[in-house]
């Protein structure tokens, strides 16, 4: 058996575990707060849009599916849309305008004030994600950035930042999907198990 291969497994698992533990030790309350903010917007009839590239695009589709179908709890479908899935829209915008605008124009078309845009970029600098977040901000949407150790250009344009303390793309993505699962889990908790906790946030709307 290859000791080199086994060592790679152990090293990757250890690195991922260390980053995951560090993140949740520091930011568990942030995850709860962002989840509650998402639940409030859904309770008020808004929707959640997601955008990202590559592995982050896959996370967008994964999380939108958990909202529309279900996570663990049996409950009504929730409005989550991944802006990464329609090849005709993506290629039309990319061809006629630029790849930088593939998410921005979808936010222009689909986003409404009070909706949420979750932009996922491990570097924090993906131009099309940044453009979409800026457009969402202009439209009065709630903006959430999920990134790595550097928030990059996301920081001034996001209401909430999930920053994973790592420069390793794979490790960042592993923590992102763990956080995304917790978003889904806690959204269900606040909307269907602990509705009273949202009342103070809904009464002023």
UniProtKB/Swiss-Prot annotation:
Residues 38-200 form the SIS domain. Zn(2+) binds at residues 62, 66, 173, 181. The keyword Zinc applies. Keywords: Carbohydrate metabolism, Cytoplasm, Isomerase, Metal-binding, Zinc. It catalyses: 2 D-sedoheptulose 7-phosphate = D-glycero-alpha-D-manno-heptose 7-phosphate + D-glycero-beta-D-manno-heptose 7-phosphate. It is found in: Cytoplasm. Its cofactor is Zn(2+). GO terms for cellular component: cytoplasm. It holds the Pfam family SIS_2. Gene3D superfamilies: Glucose-6-phosphate isomerase like protein, domain 1. Its EC number is 5.3.1.28. Its main location: cytoplasm. GO terms for biological process: carbohydrate metabolic process; D-glycero-D-manno-heptose 7-phosphate biosynthetic process. CDD domains: SIS_GmhA (cd05006). Binds 1 zinc ion per subunit. GO terms for molecular function: carbohydrate derivative binding; D-sedoheptulose 7-phosphate isomerase activity; zinc ion binding. Substrate binds at residues 53-55, 66, 95-96, 121-123, 126, 173. Pathway: Carbohydrate biosynthesis; D-glycero-D-manno-heptose 7-phosphate biosynthesis; D-glycero-alpha-D-manno-heptose 7-phosphate and D-glycero-beta-D-manno-heptose 7-phosphate from sedoheptulose 7-phosphate: step 1/1. Catalyzes the isomerization of sedoheptulose 7-phosphate in D-glycero-D-manno-heptose 7-phosphate. HAMAP family: GmhA (MF_00067). Homotetramer. The reaction produces a racemic mixture of D-glycero-alpha-D-manno-heptose 7-phosphate and D-glycero-beta-D-manno-heptose 7-phosphate. Belongs to the SIS family. GmhA subfamily. This is Phosphoheptose isomerase.
């Amino acid at each position: 058996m290859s000791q080199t291969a086994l060592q790679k497994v152990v090293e990757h698992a250890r690195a991922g575990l260390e980053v995951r533990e560090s993140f949740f030790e520091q930011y568990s309350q942030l995850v709860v707060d962002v989840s509650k903010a998402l639940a409030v917007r859904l309770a008020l009839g808004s929707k959640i849009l997601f955008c990202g590239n590559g592995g982050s695009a896959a996370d967008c589709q994964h999380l939108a599916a958990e909202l529309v179908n279900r996570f663990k709890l049996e409950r009504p479908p929730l409005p989550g849309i991944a802006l990464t899935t329609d090849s005709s829209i993506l290629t039309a915008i990319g061809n006629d305008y630029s790849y930088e605008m593939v998410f921005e124009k979808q936010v222009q078309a689909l986003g409404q004030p009070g909706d949420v845009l979750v932009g996922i970029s491990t570097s924090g600098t993906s131009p099309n994600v940044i453009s979409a977040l800026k457009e969402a901000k202009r439209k009065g949407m709630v903006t959430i950035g999920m990134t790595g150790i550097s928030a990059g250009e996301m920081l001034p344009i996001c209401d909430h930042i999930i920053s994973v303390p790592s420069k390793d793309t794979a490790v960042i993505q592993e923590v992102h999907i763990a956080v995304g699962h917790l978003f889904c889990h806690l959204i269900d908790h606040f909307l269907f198990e602990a509705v009273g906790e949202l009342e103070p946030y809904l009464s002023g709307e």
